[in-house]
From Swiss-Prot:
Cofactor: Mg(2+); Mn(2+)
UniProt-listed Enzyme Commission number(s): 6.3.2.-
Swiss-Prot/TrEMBL keywords: ATP-binding, Ligase, Magnesium, Manganese, Metal-binding, Nucleotide-binding, Protein biosynthesis
HAMAP family: RimK (MF_01552)
The name this protein goes by in its record: Probable alpha-L-glutamate ligase
Cofactor: record remark: Binds 2 magnesium or manganese ions per subunit.
Annotated GO CC locations: cytoplasm
GO process terms (BP): protein modification process; SOS response; translation
Binding site for Mg(2+) 1: D248, E260
Length: 301
């Protein structure tokens, strides 16, 4: 098969591993910088060009689209879909999961466990917003943040008010969530391919930190997940319509709660924590499922 990997940087661990795994299994692979692709959006013969060349003959495309290039990255992916190339995850599923609010609303509609979450832009009654999610301590997030950036733990009401006011000054949208203290700065990342959890790791925040993102110095270790955690993670990925996803789950006293569904989960942390060859599993999934022109929108909303 001829596979395209949409990635800004061919040297990144995840991109390297996917290329390696595909080549080992006898496929032809090209890494394309998504921002350098340009498109002819025509109803007759839509095309994608890259460095002066018409990109044709691809059987599948693997999107590794960073949060900062979501808009253009998903547009390029949509163009690949238009010319009949099989996407590992569809453009609409990626945009759905990148919008934190939209994804939370969809998960809530499906009855999937979530932390109590308030959403606001310019609330007149900050006290009422804090009360709505069960009072301090609360976690306050910028809607557009990634990798733990723009996430603040406010330990008391006064701190929560100050942070919300500061964020409001930025003219941005704010998520206010209950703080699940029993997790003690840890979460579980489930790596989903298709309808299976192929690997899972526990991420632990460093001492004195509550954000467990590996980019923030968190550590990862192998973990056994419960059947309930497994089914929650799979349902969350399917609600987004993603074939490949990293679902972050908190172990609360009242069952698993989904924090986030990541459409471009990194491979380095999960492969080193679990010793599993996740990249090859991704390529095997493409081999089984890639047929030309087969994009259908899964999930609703």
């Amino acid at each position: 098969m001829k596979i395209a990997v949409l990635s800004r940087n061919a040297k990144l661990y995840s991109t390297r591993r996917l290329v390696e795994a595909a080549k080992t299994r006898g496929h032809e692979v090209r890494v394309l910088d998504v921002l350098r692709c340009y498109m002819n959006i025509a109803s007759h013969r839509p095309s994608i060009h890259y460095k002066g060349e018409d990109l044709t003959g691809f059987d599948a495309v693997i999107p590794r689209i960073g949060a900062s290039v979501t808009f253009y990255g998903t547009a390029v992916l949509r163009q690949f879909e238009m010319i009949g190339v099989y996407p590992l995850s569809e453009s609409v599923a990626i945009t759905r999961s990148r919008d934190k609010l939209r994804s939370l609303q969809l998960l809530a509609r499906k009855g999937i466990g979530l932390p109590v979450t308030g959403f606001a832009h310019a609330p007149d009654e900050i006290d009422d917003l804090i009360k709505m999610v069960g009072g301090a301590p609360v976690v306050i997030k910028l809607l557009e943040g990634t990798q733990g950036i723009g996430v603040v733990l406010a330990e008391n009401k006064k701190a929560a008010q100050s942070v919300i006011e500061a964020f409001m000054g930025l003219k941005t949208h704010i998520l206010v969530q209950e703080f699940i203290k029993e997790t003690a700065g840890s979460d579980i990342r489930c790596f989903i391919i298709g309808d299976k959890v192929v690997a899972a790791m526990k991420r632990q925040a460093p001492e004195g930190e509550f954000r467990s993102n590996l980019h923030r110095g968190g550590s990862a270790s192998l973990v056994r997940i419960t059947p309930e955690e497994r089914s929650t993670a799979i349902r969350a990925a399917q609600t987004m319509g993603l074939n490949v996803a990293g679902v972050d789950i908190l172990r609360s006293n009242h069952g698993p709660l989904v924090m986030e569904v990541n459409s471009s989960p990194g491979l380095e942390g999960i492969e080193s924590a679990t010793g599993k060859d996740v990249a090859t599993k991704v390529i095997e999934f493409i081999e089984k499922n890639a047929t030309r022109g087969r994009t259908r929108t899964r999930g609703k909303g």
